[in-house]
Amino acid sequence: MARLAGVDLPRNKRMEVALTYIYGIGPARSKQLLEETGISPDLRTDNLTDEQIAALRDVIEGTWKVEGDLRRQVQADIRRKIEIGCYQGIRHRRGLPVRGQRTKTNARTRKGPKKTIAGKKK
């Protein structure tokens, strides 16, 4: 089983798909990475040689922030926005959607379950 950036890649998936299991690498970056290293996207993870794994590791570590470093960076960015009190930071602090979505209805993922209020008597 190949291990890159602290993640065990699934055994018999195509490399193009297996690389997306690493936080910070999506489909587009996965294709770009495979082109840079000259590895076929159709190659299965089982069939990787040690040299190919080393080449992938070098490109990933030298080029991008992935996994723990990227998660820490995202958390630090959110903390910074909260500290400076910008609009996005306020939305994060209140647990509301940050990117302009409506909140009169929906937004249940960010707001949590409904808080039922007693109805008006007739």
Swiss-Prot record:
Gene3D superfamilies: 1.10.8.50, 30s ribosomal protein s13, domain 2. Keywords: Ribonucleoprotein, Ribosomal protein, RNA-binding, rRNA-binding, tRNA-binding. Pfam families: Ribosomal_S13. It comes from the Bacteria. Residues 95-122 are annotated as: Disordered. The keyword rRNA-binding applies. One of its GO terms (cellular component) is small ribosomal subunit. GO terms for biological process: translation. Disulfide bonds: none annotated. PROSITE patterns: RIBOSOMAL_S13_1, RIBOSOMAL_S13_2. One of its GO terms (molecular function) is tRNA binding. Part of the 30S ribosomal subunit. Forms a loose heterodimer with protein S19. Forms two bridges to the 50S subunit in the 70S ribosome. Belongs to the universal ribosomal protein uS13 family. HAMAP family: Ribosomal_uS13 (MF_01315). Located at the top of the head of the 30S subunit, it contacts several helices of the 16S rRNA. In the 70S ribosome it contacts the 23S rRNA (bridge B1a) and protein L5 of the 50S subunit (bridge B1b), connecting the 2 subunits; these bridges are implicated in subunit movement. Contacts the tRNAs in the A and P-sites. NCBIfam families: uS13_bact. This is Small ribosomal subunit protein uS13. The gene is rpsM.
